Structure formats: structure tokens, C-alpha cells
Amino acid sequence: MKVTLISILTCAAVLVLHTTAAEELEAESQLMEVGMPDTELAAVDEERLFECSVSCEIEKEGNKDCKKKKCKGGWKCKFNMCVKV
């Protein structure tokens, strides 16, 4: 009886450890796959910088105080540029 119980508990422990390790590997592989290539990220950064600076320049030409456009997705407008928060 003791041997059976020890065997069952050992198998359960091995199964839990194996499952945890498999989940970690899967999460790591998804992190590596998900996301944009560096060239696409650079294009997004350039677009945000352009949108933010153009918005501010338009407001300056209209003789209004420069109220900086709110950048989205973890970015904010600072010194006429979008910067990552």
C-alpha cells in the first residue's frame, strides 16, 4: 500500500513539474514569435513622432498655444515628439 501511494505521489509530482516546464517553454516561444519585426516597430515610431510634431506645428501656426496631441499605446508627447512612457 505504501509503495503504491509513494508511486502515485511521485508520478503526480513529476507530472506537475513537467507541465510547468512545458508551459514556461510555450510562453517563451510565444513571446519570441509575437511582436513586429524591428523594421515595422521603427516605422510605427516614426509615424508617432511625425503625427505628434505635425499636430503641434499646426497649432503653433494658428497662433494657439501648443497643446500637445496625446499619443496612444504607452506613448506621450514631449518636446514635439512622441516618447515611450
UniProtKB/Swiss-Prot annotation:
Annotated GO MF terms: toxin activity
Cleavable signal peptide: 1-22
Expression sites by tissue: Expressed by the venom gland.
Propeptide: 23-48
GO CC list: extracellular region; host cell postsynaptic membrane
Disulfide bonds: C52-C66, C56-C77, C71-C82
Subcellular location: Secreted
Keyword ATP-binding: no
InterPro entries in the cross-refs: Hwtx-2-like
Role according to the record: Neurotoxin active on both insects and mammals.
Subunit comment: Monomer.
Record's protein name: U4-theraphotoxin-Hhn1a
